[in-house]
UniProtKB/Swiss-Prot annotation:
Key words, A-Z: ATP-binding, Magnesium, Metal-binding, Nucleotide-binding, Nucleotidyltransferase, RNA repair, RNA-binding, Transferase, tRNA processing
PANTHER family membership: MULTIFUNCTIONAL CCA PROTEIN
More info: A single active site specifically recognizes both ATP and CTP and is responsible for their addition.
Top EC class, one word: transferase
Single Gene Ontology MF annotation: CCA tRNA nucleotidyltransferase activity
EC number(s) given by UniProt: 2.7.7.72
Tree of life domain: Bacteria
Binding positions for ATP per the UniProt entry: 19, 22, 102, 148, 151
Pfam families cross-referenced by the UniProt entry: PolyA_pol, PolyA_pol_RNAbd
Reactions accelerated catalytically: a tRNA precursor + 2 CTP + ATP = a tRNA with a 3' CCA end + 3 diphosphate; a tRNA with a 3' CCA end + 2 CTP + ATP = a tRNA with a 3' CCACCA end + 3 diphosphate
Organism classification: Bacteria, Pseudomonadati, Pseudomonadota, Betaproteobacteria, Burkholderiales
Name under which the protein is recorded: CCA-adding enzyme
Length: 364
């Protein structure tokens, strides 16, 4: 993590902050590094060739490494929701003040380029104790932090949540802060939580805080849902499959997807999975197999169908190899050749094509 030999930051007080420091302490692979710069101005950064990319506050890309460098800042609540903040980034803002505005103590640890930790909020102790604890009462000013807490609980399955932090989340929800969350931010955190190692913990945190019913009121949440999304995580399923399993017991899954503004792929999987699970249980005959293949548009979208089968396999056993062979057998039928054989009698094309596909499935 050394920056001692980087001429781009020579003379600047720079620190690695946040997740990179936390994950290093946990012995996890290093991800993207975020840097905070103390005592500098935007003009100082521009003179060094740093590229401004921040909107609400000054953030810059290193001209060579493209890592993010943010000027140390404080923030003050000035309105409702996660956008209701006023930021101050003067050169007099200290590192400790910047760390104080962060969400959790485990994310409020800094490291110098020489490797020395700066830990005014005892985040290292909470990393060692495996505790997610809010930094201070300012946590309550940003409702996104409830979602982030759920996501971190899902990612770090052996971490507990400090009781006072959960109490604060409940007070935030009761005060209506969660109602100010916009769909894009909810989806961003929920989707990342679904891709973590224990997605059910995210649902647990949001439910205990009272936020789940506010941000996903349509969702039917029970022990079966939680068990299935955790099995999906263990199996390494992609996001669309995990989301489909999350929604499998939710009658209003389309409304939920629209509320979250979930991607089309996720909404398609959520819509098709219940059909597939039911059809797979009754697909002993070629006719039933062909009906499922056609209803799921597997001939045009075989990769999506394969992903759908993998999600269905979380619910009940599925012979993936056999189904892949069936799709391949049906796709091998030359529809053009059949159409030519039926020249002069177009009405025969559809039944002839179906019969050929059924015969292919009988031998698949």
């Amino acid at each position: 993590m050394s920056r001692t030999d980087d001429p781009g930051v020579a003379g600047l007080r720079v620190y690695i902050v946040g997740g990179a420091v936390r994950d290093d302490l946990l012995g996890l692979p290093a991800g993207d590094r975020d840097w905070v710069v103390v005592g500098a101005t935007p003009e100082d950064m521009a003179r060094r060739g740093f590229i401004p990319v921040g909107g609400d506050f000054p953030v810059f890309l290193h001209p060579r490494t493209k890592e993010e460098y943010a000027l140390a800042r404080t923030e003050r609540k000035s309105g409702r929701g996660y956008k209701g903040f006023t930021f101050y980034t003067g050169a007099d803002v200290t590192l400790e003040q910047d760390l104080q505005r962060r969400d959790l103590t485990v994310n409020a640890i800094a490291r110098t380029p020489q490797g020395e930790l700066v830990d005014p909020l005892d985040g290292v102790a909470d990393v060692r104790a495996r505790v997610l604890r809010h930094v201070g009462e300012a946590f309550a000013e940003d409702p996104v932090r409830i979602l982030r807490l759920g996501r971190f609980a899902a990612r770090f399955g052996d971490f507990s949540i400090a009781p006072e932090t959960m109490q604060l989340c409940r007070r935030m929800v009761e005060a209506g802060e969660a109602d100010a969350l916009v769909p894009e931010r909810v989806w961003k955190e929920v989707s990342r939580g679904l891709m973590a190692q224990a997605p059910s913990r995210m649902l647990d945190v949001l439910a205990r805080a009272g936020a789940l019913a506010r941000v996903m009121p349509e969702l039917h949440d029970d022990t079966a849902v939680r068990a299935e999304i955790d099995r999906a995580a263990a199996a390494g399923l992609p996001l669309a499959g995990r989301y489909a399993l999350l929604c499998r017991h939710t009658p209003e899954r389309d409304a939920l997807g629209r509320r979250l503004r979930a991607p089309v792929e996720c909404m398609d999987q959520a819509r098709l999975l219940p059909l597939a699970v039911d059809a797979l249980a009754a697909s002993a005959t070629p006719a039933a197999q062909l009906d499922l293949i056609e209803r799921c548009d597997a001939l045009r979208k075989p990769e999506r169908f394969d992903a759908l089968l993998q999600a269905a396999a979380i619910v009940a056993p599925v012979d993936l190899s056999a189904w892949r062979a069936r799709v391949q057998a049906v796709r091998a039928i030359d529809a053009g050749a059949i159409a030519r054989q039926c020249a002069g009698d177009p009405a025969r094309i559809k039944p002839a094509l179906r019969q050929a596909r059924l015969q292919a499935l009988g031998g698949a």
